[in-house]
Amino acid sequence: MANGHINARTLHELYQQLGLSTDSLEKESGFTVHYLEETFKDLPFRSEPFRPNYFSFLFIKNAFGHYTIDDQRFEVTSNTVYFTNPGNYRIFEWEKLEHTCLITFGEGFLKEYVHHDVYSDFSFLLSEVVSPRILTQHQFDQVEELCGLLYKEYKGNALYKNKIIGALVIALLLKIKEYFFQDYNPISEGNRSSQIVKKFKLSLEHHFRDLISGKTNTQLRVQDYADMQALHVNYLSSVISSKTGKTISSWIADKNITEAKIMLQDEALSIKEIASRLGFLETPHFSNYFKKHMSISPAGYRKQYFNSLS
């Protein structure tokens, strides 16, 4: 999927780029709900590859098609729910559409109208590749009722419209959590199969190799690591902290200190040269940084290390 070339911050933006009607979609709220059969009237339909920067829930009562996410292709059939989150390349294909509800929302909407720390209660929103899940008839009936209420509020003009929608989204997320994600453990996924975590760790490792070899002398920021994966910086930060138990800043700091300690054990390297190799413009800044994390200055660490060898 590496050749996909559409990047979309919202569903409205995606539909515009795909040449589809956006009449039923609001542009600014960060939330949408609509029935796909109203948009896709000429079937079969296959989208171009795209990378969305929003969450999607697809509730399929009567339809058939396929959904490709990165290198995995899933069959989508009736009475299923399909969830995707920001970041992965994907393609959707529809052969039959009679009753299918798509709900999308951005992280900003979640944090403003659901909860500012939404991932603490709904950590499954950070799961990266989730195959379609089959609902029992009772489960689907409950979800369908919530979809109907969300659609009604979305099309209405209530004074507290987005707050009402936010409350209904909480109910929907709780149902999905109850049905499928009671045992979801982000740390376990982070250790085992998180592609976002793996890519971040590889990027971190490669960057420090470039620093130490002299290929670059500029430290990357958290924003730079997010840009490498075409993710919003807040989303990447949430994924890394939830799935590793450490913030991105902590990962960077730990790597800085590890590499600094290794170089301080080489008497041929001056502290000024070590600071420069790690991207610090001034040696005092590096010394203060090292002492903050190690409670000892670089010179003190070096002396302590060589004393321990004698």
Model feature map: region roles:
Residues A158-K163, E178-D224, S242-T247:
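Short, Lys/Arg-enriched, Trp-marked, Pro/Gly-tolerant hinge/linker segments that flank
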Residues N79, L236, H285-F286, F290:
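Short hydrophobic/aromatic patch on the recognition helix
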Residues M1-G65, Q72-F74:
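Generic protein-terminus/edge-of-domain signal
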Residues A2-G4, E95-K155, K175:
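A hydrophobic/aromatic-rich effector-binding and dimerization subdomain
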Residues S242-T283, K303-S310:
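Terminal helix-turn-helix DNA-binding modules in bacterial transcription factors
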Residues D71-F83:
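Short acidic-glycine-tyrosine-enriched beta hairpin
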Residues S287-S310:
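…primarily DNA-binding HTH/wHTH and HhH modules…
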Residues Y67-T68, T84, R90-E95:
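Short beta-strand His + acidic residue motifs that chelate non-heme Fe in jelly-roll/DSBH
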